Amino acid sequence: MTITINGQTFYATLYDNETAAALKAKLPLSLNMSEQNGNEKYNYLSFSLPTNASNPGQIHAGDLMLYGSDCLVLFYESFPTSYRYTPIGRINDPSGLADAVGHGGVQVTFALG
């Protein structure tokens, strides 16, 4: 999967699970993602995805997760967490991700590739 942010393309690997497969079926998607906590961008989708949430304990920059059944979250910083997420995939090389997403909201395009 490709994730394009402000003209910069990142390559991501989707996990082999029901949630990732359901998201893949909806691609391509261009989303206006909002800023949260200085470590993530999120968007409440207009549809729900299957869930299998657990607490990962540690979030890594580049993680793509689902919060609840309809909130897509792209993390651009690493940090410990007590929240529960359903894993979807991960950006293979998140170098430059924090700079690409910037501060505030950002348009992000998810596509097959």
What are these regions (language model features)?
Residues 1-5, 48, 105-113:
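N-terminal non-globular leader segments, chiefly Sec-dependent signal peptides
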Residues 37-58:
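Compact, glycine-rich, soluble single-domain proteins
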Residues 75-91:
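Short, compositionally biased
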Residues 1-36, 40-42:
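N-terminal secretory signal peptides
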Residues 89-113:
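Well-ordered alpha/beta subsegment
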